[in-house]
Structure formats: structure tokens, C-alpha cells
């Protein structure tokens, strides 16, 4: 019984964090386009360091948002490298607005 409760708590916490992270990223993307590194830094700063999502975890969330049609990307040359900028789509804006109303 205790194991089931612990597992349920862990799953609930994971789902809450995932949903909150998606919402916060969309909220930031509503302001402007960001590339992943600066998006990670802004999320950490704005959440008073409660959300420190970096590297693979951040890309997993961004790819999931992209698969849902909530985020699009564009490439931009920055010196010798190409930066991928993320942009909230109209569907992402609608999704975010509905979440904020609920």
C-alpha cells in the first residue's frame, strides 16, 4: 500500500512539474523568441531558481511543445554557429490562454 502511495506521489509531482515547465516556457515565448540557452537562464531567473531546466531536459520539453504544434523554430546565423530560436505559435498562444483561464 505504501509503495503505491509513494509511486502515485512521484507520478503526480512529475506531471505537475512537466505541465508547469511547459506553461512557463510558453509564457516566456509569448514575450519574444528565445534560443535554448537564454530561455533556460530566463526560466531560472524568473522562477527564483525553482526551475533550473538545462540541456536534454529543456530540449525534451521544447520538442514536445513543437510536436504539439505550440512552438515553431527558426535558424539564425550567430558568428560561426547557427542558433535555433523558438517561437510560440498561434496554437500555443491559445493553449496558454486557456490554461491561464482555468
Describe the predicted segments one by one:
Residues 1-20, 99:
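Intrinsically disordered, low-complexity serine/threonine- and proline-rich regulatory segments
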Residues 13-57:
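N-terminal helix-turn-helix DNA-binding core of bacterial DNA-binding proteins
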Residues 43, 62, 96, 100:
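Short amphipathic alpha-helical/adjacent loop interface patches that line ligand
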Residues 43, 47, 75-77, 90:
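Short, well-ordered turn and helix-capping elements at secondary-structure junctions
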Residues 58-65:
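Basic amphipathic alpha-helical segments that dock to polyanions
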Residues 66-82, 87:
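Beta-hairpin "wing" of winged helix-turn-helix
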Residues 80-100:
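Basic, amphipathic "hinge/linker" alpha-helix immediately C-terminal to the N-terminal HTH DNA-binding motif
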Amino acid at each position: 500500500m505504501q509503495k503505491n502511495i509513494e509511486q502515485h506521489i512521484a507520478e503526480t509531482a512529475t506531471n505537475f512539474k512537466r505541465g508547469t515547465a511547459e506553461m512557463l516556457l510558453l509564457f516566456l515565448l509569448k514575450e519574444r523568441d528565445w534560443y535554448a540557452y537564454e530561455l533556460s537562464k530566463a526560466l531560472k531567473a524568473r522562477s527564483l531558481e525553482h526551475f533550473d531546466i538545462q540541456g536534454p531536459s529543456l530540449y525534451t520539453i521544447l520538442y514536445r511543445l513543437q510536436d504539439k504544434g505550440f512552438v515553431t523554430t527558426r535558424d539564425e546565423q550567430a558568428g560561426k554557429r547557427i542558433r535555433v530560436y523558438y517561437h510560440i505559435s498561434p496554437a500555443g498562444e491559445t493553449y496558454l490562454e486557456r490554461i491561464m483561464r482555468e
